[in-house]
């Protein structure tokens, strides 16, 4: 089945059908690396929507069968841990996202925010939740360099100013 059809099942919230189609595609072993990685991400989103977080995380980790992790996958895994208040694990994945090189010529599905803004703003949240205010403020400042008008960055800036950070 075509890539568009697989994604349409997801976008139309037909998650169980989408899971079957994505798994069949991946199990077929004939996909191009970037399509396989993106299929794993969509599979994970279906699993999370179906309230199956362990399977969602497994689908993300399955991307490692195809290549080194893309920043997009690192951010997805970071979110898995952030959503569960496992901040140290989330920090690991968001820092890894920042270390990944963006390659717009690879044919990969590139989400530019995953190579700068998103990991920085999420690292700000993680460090703040751990009580590491100075470190959180540093990451917020870094996020602001990517998106100086972003409402989250601006709210955090006021928050840290009020705290004296």
Predicted regions and their residues:
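"A position-specific structural signal for the A-helix of alpha-solenoid helical repeats
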Residues: 42, 76-79, 122, 156
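TPR-repeat structural position
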Residues: 15-16, 53, 87, 133
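Start-of-helix register in tetratricopeptide repeats
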Residues: 34-38, 72, 113, 118, ...
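Short, small-residue-biased leader/transition segments that mark boundaries at the very start
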Residues: 1-5
């Amino acid at each position: 089945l075509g890539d568009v059809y697989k994604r349409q099942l997801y976008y139309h919230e037909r998650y169980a059908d989408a899971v079957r189609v994505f798994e069949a595609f991946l199990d077929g072993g004939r996909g191009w690396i970037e399509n396989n990685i993106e299929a794993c991400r969509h599979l994970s989103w279906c699993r999370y929507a179906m309230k199956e977080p362990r399977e969602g995380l497994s689908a993300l980790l399955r991307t490692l069968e195809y290549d080194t992790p893309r920043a997009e996958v690192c951010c997805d895994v970071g979110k898995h841990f952030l959503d569960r208040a496992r901040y140290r694990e989330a920090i690991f994945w968001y820092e890894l996202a920042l270390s990944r090189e963006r390659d717009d010529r690879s044919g990969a599905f590139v989400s530019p925010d995953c190579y700068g803004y998103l990991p920085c703003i999420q690292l700000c949240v993680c460090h703040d939740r751990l009580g590491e205010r100075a470190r959180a403020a540093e990451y917020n400042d870094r996020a602001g360099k990517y998106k100086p008008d972003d409402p989250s960055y601006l709210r955090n800036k006021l928050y840290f100013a009020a705290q004296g950070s």
